[in-house]
């Protein structure tokens, strides 16, 4: 029942393999993010589990009304896959950057926000999101980060993971910045 929708970013979102293997489960919406959210909400009525993919800025601020009205308030089983989050799209300028997306999405009723830190956690989080009944905002950064979580790690929605133990400083991070926090912790240990 999983289907994918894209707002004209197949290459940037690395959707080629899914489309090749499942062309009948893919919908190219074009540069029409607001329509994509409405279509995704509608697909849930027929039992589909839509993953709507675009850049984080376009998946939140640009379409907030549609998400609020058509997805969150009605508790639709839509998964919003938002890539290139934060300042990771520097070369594309401020119009493509978002820092407020987590806050915007956390304010919505019933919306679950997931911000995985590496490939293994992203894979596990995506599976957990698909299995979860209700709206989910999956947030991904753009930078390549090393794979540092176990491949068999179970992802639990709403639960943090202790990556390192120490006695002097607590560092809290989310998403692709978890790797940077581990690097910083190693430096502080010296």
Regions found by a protein language model. Give the residues of each.
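Flexible, glycine/charged-enriched surface loops at secondary-structure junctions
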Residues: 190
């Amino acid at each position: 029942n999983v289907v994918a929708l894209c707002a004209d970013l197949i290459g940037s979102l690395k959707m080629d393999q899914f489309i090749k293997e499942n062309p009948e489960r893919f919908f190219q919406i074009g540069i029409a993010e607001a329509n994509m959210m409405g279509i995704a909400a509608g697909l849930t009525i027929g039992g589909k589990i839509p993953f709507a993919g675009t850049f984080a800025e376009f998946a939140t601020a640009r379409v907030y009304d549609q998400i609020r009205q058509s997805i969150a308030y009605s508790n639709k089983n839509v998964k919003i896959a938002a890539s290139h989050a934060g300042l990771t799209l520097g070369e594309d300028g401020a119009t493509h950057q978002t820092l407020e997306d987590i806050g915007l999405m956390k304010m919505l009723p019933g919306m679950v926000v997931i911000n995985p830190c590496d490939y293994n956690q992203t894979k596990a989080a995506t599976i957990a999101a698909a299995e979860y009944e209700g709206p989910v905002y999956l947030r991904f950064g753009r930078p390549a980060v090393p794979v540092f979580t176990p491949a068999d790690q179970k992802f639990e929605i709403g639960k943090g993971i202790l990556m390192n133990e120490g006695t002097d400083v607590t560092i809290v991070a989310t998403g692709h910045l978890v790797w940077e926090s581990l690097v910083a912790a190693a430096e502080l240990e010296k």
